[in-house]
C-alpha cells in the first residue's frame, strides 16, 4: 500500500523509480482509507538519506501510511538546507495537539556527549514525554534508544573500547511476542555506535523486555508498556551501502573507524 508524502519531496522520485507506491495529498483524499499516521523525528545528519531509508521500510506494510517529518527547533542542521527543512518538516509547537498511531525517533551522531550537553536535549525530553499521551507506539533507534532508556528509566550509556561497527548476528528471545513474529531465530542487523547501554542493566530493569540480543553487539531489540515503547539499538533502516559510506567518511575525517564487521561471512 502507498506511503503518502508531499508532492515535491526530493526522495519521492527515487522511491517511484524503485516501484514503491507513493502518493501525495491530492491523490490520497480520493481514497476512502483511514491511513496510519506516522511521525518521524529525524535527528540524523544526512536527513534525505534517512527519509529514503525509512520510507522504503514503511512502504512494506499493507496499510496506507501518512508520514509527517519532525525537526527540532533548538538545533541548526549543518548538512540539510533550511529550505528543505522548512518545506518538508514541521516543528513540535505546530503538532503538539495532534495524535499519531506511531512515531520513530532516529539516532544522532552525538553519543559521545553527555545527554544533557546535546543542544536540543530539553526539547527532545519534552517530545519523548509527549509521546506518552499522543502516540500509540514509539520506536527509538540507536542513540534515540539510548536517550529514551536514560530519560524514562535512568539507564546510563557507556563508551565502548572500539566503535561497534558492522553486521552482527542476533537471536530472538521470546517468540510469543507479536513484535518478533516472522523473525528468523537468528538474524543479521547493522550497528554503528561508540556507546552502549549494558545489556545486564537493561535486563535488571523490570519495565523493559529484551526481545533480541547479540553475543557480540549486546542489546538489540526491546519493548516496554506492552509495545508502546520499542527500543532498537542498531540501525535496521540502513541500506546495503550505508556502513561503507560511514567507514569512508570516518577515515576521511582522520578518525580511524574499524573495518565493518561482516557477520554474513563469518
Task: Please give the residue ranges for each predicted region.
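Short, surface-exposed "cap/lid" segments of acyl-processing enzymes
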Residues: 44-61
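Short loop/turn segments at strand-loop or loop-helix junctions that form parts
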Residues: 72-73, 100-110, 233
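Single conserved hydrophobic/aromatic residue that forms the stacking wall/gate
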Residues: 255-265
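Glycine-rich, highly charged phosphate/nucleotide-binding loops
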Residues: 81-96
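Short N-terminal or domain-adjacent regulatory/targeting segments
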Residues: 1-33
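A short beta-strand-loop structural module common to alpha/beta enzyme folds
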Residues: 64-76
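Pocket-forming structural segment of enzyme catalytic cores
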Residues: 43, 151-242
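Cysteine-nucleophile active-site neighborhood
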Residues: 105-174
